[in-house]
Amino acid sequence: ANTTPKRFLKEIRGVDVSEYSLGKEVQADIFTAGEVVDVTGITKGKGFQGMVKKFHIKGGWATHGHKFTRTGWSKGNRKPRRTLKGHPHAGHMWTQRVTLKNISIIDKIVKDNETLVVLKWSIPGARNSLLTLTIK
């Protein structure tokens, strides 16, 4: 498409492609102050976490010789002989796709040939991560 390589490549469904040509960048000029948008992004991950941090359980006793203070409870009953679905366990926490709805745009700032869109709320993800803004 005679353009330089980009950092992100994203397909957006439900858009009339006749308005755009191959290799054309979509600038932030389409947004105006006071407009309401939906913001979609990937949240920050917390890695492998235990039951206390992941599910806010109380944990075990901390005194009188107990060494399992931050572990979870029983994995289940004797009868089904398996762990039932939905039972909380330690494991990977977060890193999921989140959409925040009805976020208003406060301002647009033009700085060094870049247009920054200032939103009224916090956004999901780390710095320099990809966000999708959907106009309502």
Positions of PLM-derived features:
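Extended basic (Lys/Arg/His-rich) segments that typically form rRNA-contacting surfaces
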Residues: 1-136
